[in-house]
Amino acid sequence: MSEVVRRALFLAPGLALASAVSAQTPVARAVMVSTWDFGRVANAAGIEVRRARGSALDMVEAGGRVIESDPDNTSVGVGGYPDRDGRVTLDACVMNWNGDIGAVCALEDIAHPVSVARAVMEKTPHTMLVGEGARRFALDQAFETAVMPSPSAEAAWREWLKTSTYAPVSNRENTEWRSMPGGPGNHDTIGLLAIGLDGHMAGACTTSGLAFKMRGRVGDSPIIGAGLFVDDEVGAATATGVGEDVVRVAGSHAVVEAIRQGKSPTEACRSVIERLARLRGTAVADHQVAFWPCRNRGNGAAGRSSPVSPSP
């Protein structure tokens, strides 16, 4: 194993889980998982929807909406940092158990892109709308608007303008692998996976993308197969980190397919991260990518790459 690959591998702790299911038994209750510490709030919203007889798709949408509404979250929704031109552009996608998908990219002025993505899936013959077309569709469907950037996000952008150094980095959960997650800045994209009481799965991703990105940049989050993939026969996966790297290996799809081939969720994460490290070598030595798979029986794992290797 090369040094780049060796340094890339270890399990990540940042998984928020809400369930009452053993990892070794068939699903008996609804399950919901999402990324990072703030995912606990999303999970609580999803489980509340489930109590009202909501589906897995209802659960992940509800969880995503809660995070999109948080003005203190700088990488999702109304609190998201703007691009280099000072404009907040939002990306989201949803995928249902039967292969139905919907996505929006570079959406502006709309409070809940995850709900717009669902509407694209359910109310149009298309799978993705972008830019002004996505915004026009959202307004036609009477989705709630929002003023963005927030005052704090605009202040951060104006501070960035003083140097305008174009080196956007993901709002990744940790720079040092030993740092425990928990601070409000220790996060990025939220990915959500759920299993309803009917046993069917669904997933969602929502993000404002890289802070101070080039205008028009889209990462992995709204791309089905990269930031999210759901297959009722096997399981589902979501991703976070440097989106360009996730897209290069169709990361979430690759993780699910590795599980289909017999790997455990942990082994599946490892195999895709190893593949990325072999493919890109030193180009990804300072990058972070993370995957969160969940099998259709409810058991899952989390794995990520990191530029810092844990001690032997």
Model segments located where?
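Generic hydrophobic alpha-helical segments
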Residues: 16-17, 70
